[in-house]
């Protein structure tokens, strides 16, 4: 069954679960693949959710998943930003995904980078205008696609 594969990547929503319900056989499949020695990675394109939140949710549903196996859009973006080593950033993001950026110096007045995620109701003219002025003054932009 494993062939030349070293690992398997699963999306959370619509693959492992949908609207809070586990797809039949999904838990057993992951357990079986793990028992065969395959590396498991779980992906979510959500900017609102942290790795920890996703792992905890899946564990409550019966999956044997570890936080380190989960990659969310906010986590991947925070890792990318860390490689850039900015002096500061303004993270326009709400929800648990914001916790992935806790190690950065946050500055919404003179950030080196502006990170845009799902900012919900605070994604308004005032903040967009502020971001545009900061970009024109030299801040750089990193964008995540908001959740639908």
Task: Please annotate each region the language model reported.
Residues 2-148:
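HAD-like aspartate-dependent phosphatase fold
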